[in-house]
Each structure stands twice: as structure tokens, then as C-alpha cells.
Amino acid sequence: YQLDSFPTQQNVRAGRFYPYYRVKRLAAEPLLDAIDTSTGRPTKFKNLPLGTRAIELPDAEYPNYFLNTFGKPRRASVCECERTPDENLAQALHTLNGDIVSAKIADPAGRIAELMKAEKPPLEMIQEIYLATVCRLPSAEETEVCQQIVAESPSPKEGYEDLMWA
């Protein structure tokens, strides 16, 4: 799962053997689950225990603005064609300005708050954020940029929250 998403001169001709990861859009349910996992804050669905993942929802009777915005089908038929794979303005605005993602990142019981309580050194904080969000360690150049962002932020917590959001 940690394959590079860019083809190289060595592997570009071996496309059918999956030598690199082909980037594709996540469906609504796995996307919300990924956000929950990376931020450390699960979504609460009505009448279900905390920690129930979006992918585990038994039917379409669990309204959720995020899932609806990102194309979760109503399941009126068994056809996968109900799912809307296209990006739209509502998704872009929700990602940029929506309160769900930012609230999960800034949650006092979330991953950033827990890392701050552990008083880890800045490099470890950046590495943890990268592993939680993009499943890899940052490159030396990325680490340098991240350290600069945190240093220029009003507070370290806000800097780390900005890194996770980005």
C-alpha cells in the first residue's frame, strides 16, 4: 500500500503488473472512515454505538451530511450506478470550509491533542501526522517545510492542526 503513485522510467511499461499505485478517489464511506482514523475521532451515527464505521452502516437510514455530500447512494436499487463518482462544488466547499473535518482535527480528545499531551519532539509529531494521514514518513524536504509551518504558526498546536488539515 505504500507504493509510489508516480510511474518511473523503470516501471511505466509494466502497468498491468501494478508496479505503482494508481490514484483513485475514495468512496464516501471509506473517506469518512479514513478521516475518523487519521484524526482519532470517530463519527457518531444515530442509534449506533460510538466507533461504528461508515462502511459498517446496515442501510441508508443513517443520514449523514458528509456521506450524502460525497456521494453515498440511497440504495434504492442494487445497482452500483447509484453512487455518484463525480466531484462537485459542495464537496470542495465542505472539504475547505466544512466544520466536520476541522472539528475532528481540533477536538480536545483527537490525535493532535493526544500528541501534544505526550509532549513529543516536533520531528516525531510531524512523522506521526504523516503516518496517520498519508501512510508514509515525510521526506527530508517535507519535514523541513512542516517544521517551518509549525514554527511560523501562532501556536504549535495550530501548526500541527494545519499540517493535518493540509
Indicate residue ranges for each PLM-predicted region:
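An acidic, gly/pro-interrupted, aromatic-rich
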Residues: Y1-L137
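C-terminal structured "cap/appendage" subdomains that terminate the fold
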Residues: M116-W165
